[in-house]
From Swiss-Prot:
It comes from Bacillus subtilis (strain 168). Belongs to the CotF family. The gene is yraD. Coiled coil: none annotated. Keywords: Sporulation. This is Spore coat protein F-like protein YraD. It holds the Pfam family Coat_F. PANTHER family: SPORE COAT PROTEIN F-LIKE PROTEIN YHCQ. Transmembrane segments: none annotated. InterPro entries: Ferritin-like, Spore_coat_CotF-like. Its main location: other.
Length: 99
C-alpha cells in the first residue's frame, strides 16, 4: 500500500501486538463456535470432527496467548497489569490522529 494512504487511513500503526491480539480474539471465537457446534452435532461422526477442530483451535489459542505473554502484551493472570496495558493502548489509539 502507498505510505501516504497508510498514514491517512491509520494503517501505518498496525503493529505485531495489534495483529496478535486480533488473532487471539479470533481464536477465542473459534473455540467457542466449535464447542457450540459440537454440542449440536447431529451424528457422532460430525461431533468427532468438530471436537478434533476444537482441540486444534485450543492449541492455536494456547500458542498465541503464550507468545503474547512472552512479549508482555497479554496478562491473563494479572488483571491489574492487563488493565494498565489496556489503558495505555487506549491512550495510544486516541493520540493516533495527532501523531
Amino acid at each position: 500500500m502507498n505510505p501516504i494512504i497508510e498514514y491517512l487511513t491509520g494503517m501505518n500503526v498496525l503493529t505485531d501486538q495489534i495483529i496478535a491480539m486480533d488473532l487471539l480474539i479470533s481464536a477465542k471465537n473459534g473455540v467457542r463456535n466449535y464447542a457450540m457446534a459440537a454440542t449440536e452435532a447431529g451424528t457422532p461422526e460430525v461431533k468427532e470432527v468438530l471436537i478434533r477442530h476444537l482441540e486444534e483451535a485450543l492449541d492455536m489459542h494456547e500458542q498465541l496467548s503464550s507468545y503474547m505473554m512472552e512479549k508482555g502484551w497479554y496478562h491473563p493472570w494479572n488483571p491489574d497489569e492487563q488493565v494498565k496495558l489496556n489503558l495505555k493502548n487506549i491512550d495510544t489509539a486516541i493520540q493516533l490522529p495527532t501523531l
